Amino acid sequence: MTAEVTAADAEVLLAQPRGFCAGVDRAIDIVERALELHGAPIYVRHEIVHNRYVVEDLRGKGAVFIDELDQAPAGAIVVFSAHGVSQAVRGEAEARGLRVFDATCPLVTKVHIEVARMRAAGREIVMIGHKGHPEVEGTLGQAQGGMYLVETVEDVAALQVSDPGNLAYVTQTTLSVDDAAAVAGALKARFPGIVEPKKSDICYATQNRQDAVKLLAPECDLVLVVGSTNSSNSNRLREVAERKGVAAYLIDGAHAIDPAWLQGRRSIGITAGASAPEVLVQQVVERVRELGAVSVRTMPGLEESVAFPLPKGLSRKIAQTESLE
């Protein structure tokens, strides 16, 4: 042991489930398969998922991350990120002759379909979400007008709509379950006739990881959340732990751990956002062990078995390539 030891004899508790969800797995697979089929460069609009490690790994394999489609040459292969895009972006891609592989999470696509259906029925739509998040921008861009964005209960109180009797609402898929429920409750109280989604828009992985932290936090005196600062669902995990009265930090990886955080801690919880790979979790565990932790235990929890298929166009190309080998 060295003088750096700060978590002497502490136990590490791992949340279950944690880390990659099916939508993130699929999105990364799409970029990697596109690179295998077509070679570099493959252009990706926005970060494929909100994780620095994942983005840098794909960049090293030949992915080029762009903010707007005009940064890709005409006719190039472009991947849309897991967060989804607006109808305007889809139209621009078609107009420029870009070959698109769509990595939009199927659960985000479900919300897009809800928006189209509700607008076709003549309803205005309130979206619960974080302003400026790519998923929110993509969902708001599914309709030309008739949509409103709220983030808080206070936003609901100040909301002015054209037809209060003909409203529906949807939510960003990565919100705090508790916060979204509070805002939805405020919407239903103010607009009693508002139509809600047939099934919650918050995705299974967001729900499961937040539930896991609710079980983890009472057993710990510190929680480390592995995830990037621009990851919505990772930030929500940190907030869930803090609301349970536990100190919590969001970290990109083991290098970000301040040994002082671990001083005197007896039980250190670790989880990871849906866009954070397990390799980063294991590096964090190893670093905490270097700082004095003596045991590692995984909490009981759900074993997820969700998987999403690749886009049909990409699957066909893979099958054609394999048949020629």
Curated annotation (Swiss-Prot):
Cofactor descriptive note: Binds 1 [4Fe-4S] cluster per subunit.
EC numbers on record: 1.17.7.4
UniProt entry keywords in alphabetical sequence: 4Fe-4S, Iron, Iron-sulfur, Isoprene biosynthesis, Metal-binding, Oxidoreductase
Positions of the catalytic residues: 135 (proton donor)
Protein's GO biological process: dimethylallyl diphosphate biosynthetic process; isopentenyl diphosphate biosynthetic process, methylerythritol 4-phosphate pathway; terpenoid biosynthetic process
Cofactor: [4Fe-4S] cluster
Function: Catalyzes the conversion of 1-hydroxy-2-methyl-2-(E)-butenyl 4-diphosphate (HMBPP) into a mixture of isopentenyl diphosphate (IPP) and dimethylallyl diphosphate (DMAPP). Acts in the terminal step of the DOXP/MEP pathway for isoprenoid precursor biosynthesis.
NCBIfam families documented for this protein: ispH_lytB, PRK01045.1-2, PRK01045.1-4
HAMAP family from the UniProt entry: IspH
Protein name stated in the entry: 4-hydroxy-3-methylbut-2-enyl diphosphate reductase
